[in-house]
């Protein structure tokens, strides 16, 4: 399971002209589900995403996680993160989970974020989405479990 996390000052996702999720300061989480992923991996990745210390403390050091910084989380499914790009000029998607399984694990990940008392917003699974963000830093990390 993969999370591409970006520290943002604001982010939103729109589906068919409707804003489905919007946050101020926090994390935009682009979530990719791979073929062998399960709830245990989703739990571990959620723990890492919410615990990752990429927000500045009083001394300006990256020392606070999103909860400590008072931020929110916007989770957007992105199957292309599981692409095989090692050869050729076209990505392959055999590493990605089947759509039903990917959706179930995406929803599970979102629920785990909510259970941690995070203000959690979402996109819409498998939809054509427009994601807008202001990357703060820029600060972007690839987390994989």
Curated annotation (Swiss-Prot):
The keyword Magnesium does not apply. GO terms for biological process: D-amino acid catabolic process. The keyword DNA repair does not apply. Homodimer. It is an enzyme of class 3 (hydrolase). GO terms for molecular function: D-tyrosyl-tRNA(Tyr) deacylase activity; Gly-tRNA(Ala) deacylase activity; Ser(Gly)-tRNA(Ala) hydrolase activity; tRNA binding. A Gly-cisPro motif from one monomer fits into the active site of the other monomer to allow specific chiral rejection of L-amino acids. This is D-aminoacyl-tRNA deacylase. It catalyses: glycyl-tRNA(Ala) + H2O = tRNA(Ala) + glycine + H(+); a D-aminoacyl-tRNA + H2O = a tRNA + a D-alpha-amino acid + H(+). Belongs to the DTD family. It comes from Citrobacter koseri (strain ATCC BAA-895 / CDC 4225-83 / SGSC4696). Pfam families: Tyr_Deacylase (PF02580). Keywords: Cytoplasm, Hydrolase, RNA-binding, tRNA-binding. Its EC number is 3.1.1.96. One of its GO terms (cellular component) is cytoplasm. An aminoacyl-tRNA editing enzyme that deacylates mischarged D-aminoacyl-tRNAs. Also deacylates mischarged glycyl-tRNA(Ala), protecting cells against glycine mischarging by AlaRS. Acts via tRNA-based rather than protein-based catalysis; rejects L-amino acids rather than detecting D-amino acids in the active site. By recycling D-aminoacyl-tRNA to D-amino acids and free tRNA molecules, this enzyme counteracts the toxicity associated with the formation of D-aminoacyl-tRNA entities in vivo and helps enforce protein L-homochirality. A motif (Gly-cisPro motif, important for rejection of L-amino acids) lies at residues 137-138.
């Amino acid at each position: 399971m993969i999370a591409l996390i970006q520290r943002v000052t604001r982010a939103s996702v729109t589906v068919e002209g409707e804003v489905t999720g919007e946050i101020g300061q926090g994390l935009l989480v682009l979530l990719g589900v791979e073929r062998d992923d399960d709830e245990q991996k989703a739990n571990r990745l959620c723990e890492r995403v919410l615990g990752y210390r990429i927000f500045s403390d009083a001394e300006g050091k990256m020392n606070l996680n999103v909860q400590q910084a008072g931020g929110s989380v916007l989770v957007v499914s992105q199957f292309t993160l599981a692409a095989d790009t090692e050869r050729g000029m076209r990505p392959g998607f055999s590493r990605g989970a089947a759509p039903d399984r990917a959706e179930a694990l995406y929803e599970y990940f979102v629920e785990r974020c909510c259970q941690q008392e995070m203000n959690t917003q979402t996109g819409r699974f498998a939809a054509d989405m427009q994601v807008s963000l202001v990357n703060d830093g820029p600060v972007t990390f690839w987390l994989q479990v």
